[in-house]
């Protein structure tokens, strides 16, 4: 778990949620620097969550953000399993429906922003509803 210095000078442990939020904020800034426009963060639908929803031109981009301290067990990108992909697809499907859209009517893709140590990897179109 990550630590952060407190005002008293002694470090305090960050919760998993706080650590995840920090990496998601970093991914958002990084993607905005690449020209994407922010739409939403931490979108919850039945049974799933999408870390970031961005826009690149006319494309809606659903982003999964992952962080791993090292690549010892395959790195951050390797942690996006088929099961996780299925949940993300279902969550995106529900979000699109709430916004009067579907995979058939909205140009969209699923990206992964993976932080492994100090390295960032942006995997565009990492998976889709036909995978």
Curated annotation (Swiss-Prot):
**UniProt-annotated stretches for the region Disordered:** 1-21
**One annotated GO molecular function:** nucleic acid binding
Q: Where is the composition biased (Polar residues)?
A: 1-19
Pfam assignment, any one = UPF0102
| UniProt cross-references to NCBIfam families, sorted A to Z | PRK12497.1-3, YraN family protein
Q: Which family does it belong to?
A: Belongs to the UPF0102 family.
Tell me what this protein is called.
UPF0102 protein YraN
């Amino acid at each position: 778990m990550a630590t952060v210095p407190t005002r008293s000078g002694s470090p305090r442990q960050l919760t998993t949620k706080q650590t995840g939020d920090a990496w998601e904020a970093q991914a958002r800034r990084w993607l905005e620097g690449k020209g994407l426009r922010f739409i939403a963060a931490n979108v919850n639908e039945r049974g799933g969550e999408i870390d970031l929803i961005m826009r690149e031109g006319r494309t809606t981009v659903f982003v999964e953000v992952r962080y791993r301290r090292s690549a010892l067990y395959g790195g951050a990108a390797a942690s996006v399993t088929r099961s996780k992909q299925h949940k993300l697809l279902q969550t995106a499907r529900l979000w699109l429906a709430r916004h009067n859209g579907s995979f058939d009517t909205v140009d969209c893709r699923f990206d992964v922003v993976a932080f492994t140590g100090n390295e960032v990897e942006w995997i565009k179109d990492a998976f889709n509803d036909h995978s």
